[in-house]
Amino acid sequence: MATELSDAEKRKLLRERRQQKFSNGGASSRLNKITGQQQNSFLSSTSVLDEPKVTPSGNKKSSNVSDEEVEKSTKEIQDLLSSIPGNKDNSETDAAETNPEVALFQQLLKMQQQGGGFQNGSPDASTPDLFSSLLNNDTNTTASATQMLPNFVDEKVLKYYKFKVSKLKSYIILIKWALLAPYVYFIMHPNPTVLQASNLLSQIVERSNFFSIFTGLEIVFISIYYQMLKKLQRDNNVTATQNAGGILKYLTMIPEGILPIRNIQGKIGLALEYFDVASMYVTDICFVLVLFGVMKYYHSSFPISVPIEPPIAGIQ
């Protein structure tokens, strides 16, 4: 009666069959069959199982040195290293090994402090301090980089500043138009003798003097507006560059040195301020031209009766 094999015995038999199958080059042929390699392939077609095993030689030289002698020699080496002057700690040695640049700067710093490498143990006065020069260069580089960076302002502060500027501009325009409207009315009046009570008023309402008086008023009001605008910029820490809008956002993407103009962002911001002031002058000119047309139509539609003076006695 045949006895049933256990699972361990079955695995053992399968392992032995596989080893017999892979012996004598069977592993290499199975590997080539799986990978599809041919015999003339450049890749290695020999299986690891078919490679000859290298048996390590058992003729190792036994060490005759006892543990006590090893400890003694190690202690002597440590004493010798500790007796060397200027020997660094293990932490400094590890730092020097991991970062040789740090070790070089530490050595140079020690030479600067001790005056080593100079005659008579003192540094030469004509030789610049290496670390002072490095620190000064680093400080100057950081300062210049900080100046080149745009000064960012809080969005709420910028919105409040723009609101104040719009309010100031509206007040200036309303005051100017309140003065220009009656002035144009009297200039376009068909009866010039209405305001001839004094010589000054007659000169003001003279049409030939209109452009000079209008330009003088514009210069005064634009100067007031520009000075108050600068005061708002100082109070809110806002510059012309920050208030320029989206144009400078595209210019900041251009690297420094590509454009031939230096500080082009500041120049464009200042040009936009001047353009704003010039646009106010052009707006007032357009307003005056409209007033001329309205007043001419008004006086022609509603003529004013001019009183006829009685004839002087004795004159026929």
From Swiss-Prot:
It is found in: Endoplasmic reticulum membrane; Golgi apparatus membrane. One of its GO terms (biological process) is retrograde vesicle-mediated transport, Golgi to endoplasmic reticulum. Residues 7-19 have a biased composition (Basic and acidic residues). Residues 188-209, 298-316 are lumenal. GO terms for cellular component: endoplasmic reticulum membrane; GET complex; Golgi membrane. Residues 1-75 are annotated as: Disordered. The keyword Transmembrane applies. It is a multi-pass membrane protein. The chain crosses the membrane at residues 168-187, 210-229, 277-297. InterPro entries: GET2, Get2/sif1. Disulfide bonds: none annotated. Residues 1-167, 230-276 are cytoplasmic. Residues 22-48, 56-65 have a biased composition (Polar residues). Keywords: Endoplasmic reticulum, ER-Golgi transport, Golgi apparatus, Membrane, Transmembrane, Transmembrane helix, Transport. Component of the Golgi to ER traffic (GET) complex, which is composed of GET1, GET2 and GET3. Within the complex, GET1 and GET2 form a heterotetramer which is stabilized by phosphatidylinositol binding and which binds to the GET3 homodimer. Required for the post-translational delivery of tail-anchored (TA) proteins to the endoplasmic reticulum. Together with GET1, acts as a membrane receptor for soluble GET3, which recognizes and selectively binds the transmembrane domain of TA proteins in the cytosol. The GET complex cooperates with the HDEL receptor ERD2 to mediate the ATP-dependent retrieval of resident ER proteins that contain a C-terminal H-D-E-L retention signal from the Golgi to the ER. Belongs to the GET2 family. This is Golgi to ER traffic protein 2. The lineage of its organism: Eukaryota, Fungi, Dikarya, Ascomycota, Saccharomycotina. The gene is GET2.
